[in-house]
């Protein structure tokens, strides 16, 4: 969205062009993947937005991203593992960093301020609902600052 939220559970039966495809279920020729520089290693932690970045790079190079409703992937929300190994609150660091970095990289700087408010609301909501502790707010702040200063690849 214009304020940085990644839309989830988008379902359609229609095949067509889109800006990006979720990284857990997309295919690209190795030659094209390599030519575009693969995934940007500045996207850190929980694998968020590196797939959108790659889709934007495909389009910028004149390629197309096609959504095909045929293949289906089910994202299992396991209780342990993944980014939760370090600290549940640290996920806000990755999310904040990657969001700001993505918006800067793709010249969407006017969307950074709304994204900051959105990310702050997520961290506060998670605190109120006891999904994460108060450290989530600190991690979100650190991620925002680091995302602002990470050198663009």
Predicted regions and their residues:
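Ligand-binding pocket scaffold of soluble enzyme catalytic domains
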Residues: 9-11, 24-26, 54, 65, ...
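Short glycine/proline- and charge-enriched loop/turn segments
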Residues: 9-12, 36-39, 80-86
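Non-catalytic, C-terminal membrane-associated alpha-helical segments of glycosyltransferases
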Residues: 89-98, 108-153
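A short, conserved alpha-helix in the catalytic core of glycosyltransferases
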Residues: 20-21, 25-37, 42-72
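Short, flexible, basic/aromatic active-site loop/helix in glycosyltransferases
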Residues: 1-19
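Nucleotide-sugar-dependent glycosyltransferase catalytic core
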Residues: 46-47, 74-97
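Short secondary-structure boundary/hinge segments and terminal tails
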Residues: 51, 76-77, 121
């Amino acid at each position: 969205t214009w304020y940085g939220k990644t839309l989830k559970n988008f379902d359609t039966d229609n095949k067509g062009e889109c800006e990006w495809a979720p990284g857990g279920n997309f295919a690209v020729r190795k030659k094209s993947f390599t030519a575009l520089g693969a995934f940007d290693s500045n996207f850190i932690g929980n694998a968020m937005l590196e797939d959108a970045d790659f889709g934007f790079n495909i389009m910028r190079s004149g390629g197309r991203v096609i959504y095909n409703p045929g293949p289906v992937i089910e994202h299992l929300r396991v209780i342990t593992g993944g980014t939760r190994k370090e600290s549940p609150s640290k996920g806000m660091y990755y999310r904040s960093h990657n969001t700001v970095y993505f918006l800067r990289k793709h010249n969407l700087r006017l969307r950074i301020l709304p994204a900051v408010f959105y990310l702050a609301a997520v961290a506060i909501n998670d605190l109120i609902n006891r999904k994460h502790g108060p450290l989530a707010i600190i991690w979100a702040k650190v991620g925002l600052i680091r995302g602002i200063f990470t050198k663009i690849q």
